[in-house]
UniProtKB/Swiss-Prot annotation:
Keyword Electron transport applies: no
Gene3D superfamilies attached to this UniProt entry: 3.30.160.810, Translation factors (2.40.30.10)
Protein name: Large ribosomal subunit protein uL3
Any one GO cellular component localisation term in the record: cytosolic large ribosomal subunit
Entry-linked PROSITE patterns: RIBOSOMAL_L3
MF terms in GO: rRNA binding; structural constituent of ribosome
Protein's organism: Shewanella oneidensis (strain ATCC 700550 / JCM 31522 / CIP 106686 / LMG 19005 / NCIMB 14063 / MR-1)
Keywords: Methylation, Ribonucleoprotein, Ribosomal protein, RNA-binding, rRNA-binding
Oligomer status and interactors: Part of the 50S ribosomal subunit. Forms a cluster with proteins L14 and L19.
Intrachain disulfide bonds: none
Family: Belongs to the universal ribosomal protein uL3 family.
Annotated region (Disordered), positions in chain: 136-155
Function: One of the primary rRNA binding proteins, it binds directly near the 3'-end of the 23S rRNA, where it nucleates assembly of the 50S subunit.
Length: 212
């Protein structure tokens, strides 16, 4: 089954192999994903599962959300996510079903999607790895400036897409082909090798790797 799940980044640690080799791992808490809606070709034009996870205070739920959760008969969660299904996937899954981390028991590699840490407004050196200019030799103001961006008469303008200073981070990022180190069904934990996007407690979408 190639269905993805929603998880929460707990943090990083390391585990040791039988040979004593240290492996850096990210701990992802994958609590039960409750199915709130099943989208089909007949009704929606495509196949997908809408899921929620976690909990949310009753006074923080909007009336449309409350009606949607009541209709599906599922406890309100901290958000709603949609997971697309390919042909033949998700057969037999109905509204109210709960998916857990056990579906990754036979998966070797996963793709993890999250929102990267926001860095605010940053210059070209930090944002795009530009080289700095001379610290001396007559340069007193432009050590970290972007340099020439539009030339003179030719082309006499700044090309679209030019790498410049601006807002950095807080983007949807996917890290591909992360090794699954351990699946702990009892504690709803998934351990993957290496780092994943985002800050601690951030929501993540975990799917079997498309390039595995």
């Amino acid at each position: 089954m190639a269905i993805g799940l929603i998880g929460r980044k707990v943090g990083m640690t390391r585990i040791f192999t039988e040979d004593g080799v240290s492996i850096p791992v990210t701990v992802i808490e994958v609590a039960g994903n409750r199915v709130t809606q099943v989208k089909t070709l007949e009704t929606d034009g495509y196949r997908a599962l809408q899921v929620t996870t976690g909990t949310k205070k009753a006074n923080r739920i909007t009336k449309p959300e409350a009606g949607h959760f009541a209709k599906s008969g599922v406890e309100a969660g901290r958000g709603l996510w949609e997971l697309r299904l390919a042909d033949g996937e998700g057969e037999g899954i109905e509204v109210g079903a709960e998916l857990n981390v056990g579906i990754f028991a036979d998966v070797a590699k996963v793709d993890v999607t999250g929102q990267s840490k926001g860095k605010g407004f940053q210059g070209g050196v930090k944002r795009w790895n530009f080289r700095t200019q001379d610290m001396t030799h007559g340069n007193s103001l432009s050590h970290r400036s972007n340099g020439s961006i539009g030339q003179n008469q030719t082309p006499g303008r700044v090309f679209k897409g030019k790498k410049m200073s601006g807002h950095m981070g807080a983007e949807r990022v996917t890290t591909q082909n992360l090794d699954v180190v351990r699946v702990d069904v009892e504690r709803n934990l998934l351990l993957v090798k290496g780092a994943v996007p985002g800050a601690t407690n951030g929501d993540l979408i975990i799917k079997p790797a498309v390039k595995a």
